[in-house]
Amino acid sequence: MWWTPIPEDIVRDPAAFRVGRLTKAHGLKGAVKLELFTDDPDKRFVPGAEFSLQVPESSPWHGRTLTLTELRWYNSHPVGFFDGVADRTAAESLAKAILWMTPPADEAAEPDAWYDHQLVGLTVLRDGVEVGTVSLVDHFPAQDLLHVDTPSGTVLVPFVQAIVPSVDVEAGTLVVTPPLGLFEEIPDETPTAEPTPAEAAEPAPEGDDAR
């Protein structure tokens, strides 16, 4: 698994959040294809936007920031151009880098939208009973996944309205209505039938028929 520590400046900033991942070089002029973790790329990826980089310590980009010069779309795929990334070699050195940013202080909160740091640490309730705590948020193209730590292990919960109908950041809680089996073992629907009174009373075979 390709994993690197989150940059220290991001750790110190609880408002920071991930907006994308650089996947691979595109063309010869330093462009890099993007995997987006935001549903509003036109707002996050504007010329001049600055990103902190989550990369290995051995990367030449470790401890540096990246500034966007332009975002283009090729066949419905986002491609970014950045200051200091002038050719394919430089673009390839950024493959798998995760982009973090901090929203402007005057940015208005959107309804039913939360940053990762607002979700991590929330108490998860099911039918009013605490079942775990959110420990991590994973972002995927289809949907986001909440990692919920429970006494029996970590449960991955799809962050969709049908399963997570309510989030109350001020109260520190998140309500789940999970399908059967997500937080517990699915019961055996075909239990072994108990013997009838006649079968229970039948004596054990003797002699050559006994086994």
From Swiss-Prot:
Family annotation (Gene3D superfamilies): PRC-barrel domain, RimM
Task: Give a Pfam family name.
Answer: PRC_RimM
Chain spans, region Disordered: 184-211
Q: Which GO terms describe its cellular component?
A: cytoplasm; ribosome
What is any one GO biological process for this UniProt entry?
A: rRNA processing
Q: Where is the PRC barrel domain?
A: 111-182
What UniProt keywords apply to this chain's record, in alphabetical order? Chaperone, Cytoplasm, Ribosome biogenesis, rRNA processing
Chain intervals with Low complexity compositional bias: 189-204
UniProt-recorded Gene Ontology molecular function terms? ribosome binding
Q: Tell me the compartments it is located in.
A: Cytoplasm
What domain of life does the native source organism fall in?
Answer: Bacteria
What exactly does this protein do?
An accessory protein needed during the final step in the assembly of 30S ribosomal subunit, possibly for assembly of the head region. Essential for efficient processing of 16S rRNA. May be needed both before and after RbfA during the maturation of 16S rRNA. It has affinity for free ribosomal 30S subunits but not for 70S ribosomes.
Tell me how this protein assembles: Binds ribosomal protein uS19.
Q: Which PANTHER family match?
A: RIBOSOME MATURATION FACTOR RIMM
Family, similarity comment:
Belongs to the RimM family.
Present the record's domain note.
The PRC barrel domain binds ribosomal protein uS19.
- Official protein name in the record: Ribosome maturation factor RimM
Report the source organism: Clavibacter michiganensis subsp. michiganensis (strain NCPPB 382)
Gene that produces this protein: rimM
